[in-house]
């Protein structure tokens, strides 16, 4: 929303200093009425095995994390994807803002299918059911570090944009070869990005949007390399960046 020259994707919707969630989301209006459960051993709880009524009981905003000194402490629950989309759409409509695109990631672990997560195919279908219901096909990007998810999207929904997440120092050519097609976006860990990688992506007709970039210095460096956007925990930093030059 800050500039067409440098799109910014908030990581987990600005997971730390999210004044937008705190002050603008009607989905949290009933928080004081709820009973909250605090966990000492989170490994005993498998969210994949829970129904949403159980998930909604957990307070995900009150526990502070030392990595994020600017975190604001407030009670919050995990909203459903459809609920989140409705809230965002309502907010931009009220404030007469441009409609945003949605970068939705399938978080999958190796050998976790059926125990800690749905299969990639099922995961994508769950997401796409909401995307189609909300008529967001032209405004959604499916991102994943799991190539199975993206391969399924490309096969079943070829018009949907895809973003390949990269967290290992493997060369660009092999990553694209393993995927089997050119994604819309190549999204590597930001420390892996150099001018050569940016040029390779652009030569292949692929946008490059690194993650997770949380300092002005790193944002400026990547901007000067010519990246197409960034993923960050702090989209508010973009107000301090000269995007025109």
Map each language-model feature to its residues:
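C-terminal active-site rim and adjoining tail of enzyme catalytic domains
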Residues: 160-245
